[in-house]
Regions:
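Active-site helix-to-loop segments that bind/position phosphate- or nucleotide-bearing substrates
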Residues: 31-166
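Trp/Phe/Arg-rich N-terminal binding region typifying the photolyase-homology
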Residues: 1-38
């Protein structure tokens, strides 16, 4: 069956139960050198621009979700306005530290309001402090591994990115 996959240029990605890819069988996507070349040739300025676009999409989505609340308290209305003000600053961020700060501030507003009805207080990754944090952690893990599998499938270098850098 693997030979048939190769004949028809089908790549088989095997995932663990948490969606972490552990084996890719078939046509090696690492040969997609044009994609990787474009990925590596991005300047710092271009990568910062891409990171800003990603954060703008994320934060606009969070703002949209907050705006959809039916009965908005005065506090929520004020925080929606504050979120709008921060979003306007994102295109002008001069570096990753500023961008991370804007993202953090909006996320704090979003999570504090969006999950208020379930008595959620803060994000605690890997702490398993309560059911919402446990479920968020599981969901983030699945999402991260699934996206990683898709990126590997297309040939991206998962260790060279535009935003969360180490």
């Amino acid at each position: 069956i693997i030979r048939k996959f190769q004949d028809f240029w089908i790549t088989l990605v095997l995932l663990k139960q948490n969606f972490l890819p552990y084996l890719i069988i078939g046509n090696e996507t690492e040969g997609n050198f044009i994609l990787r070349k474009k990925q590596y040739e991005k300047t710092e300025e271009e990568m910062l621009h891409i990171a800003k676009e990603i954060i703008l999409l994320k934060t606009r989505n969070q703002l949209s979700l907050l705006k959809n609340f039916r009965d908005k308290s005065e506090s929520l209305k004020w925080e929606i306005e504050k979120t709008k003000d921060i979003i306007e600053k994102i295109p002008w961020a001069e570096n990753y530290e500023n961008l991370l700060g804007y993202e953090w501030n909006i996320s704090k507003i979003f999570f504090g309001n969006y999950f208020e009805s379930i008595d959620w207080h803060r994000r605690a990754p890997r702490a398993k402090a309560d059911i919402p944090n446990l479920l968020l952690d599981i969901w983030y893990t699945y999402l991260f591994h699934f996206v990683e599998a898709l990126l590997r499938l297309y040939g991206f270098d998962n260790y060279y990115w535009v935003y969360h850098r180490t």
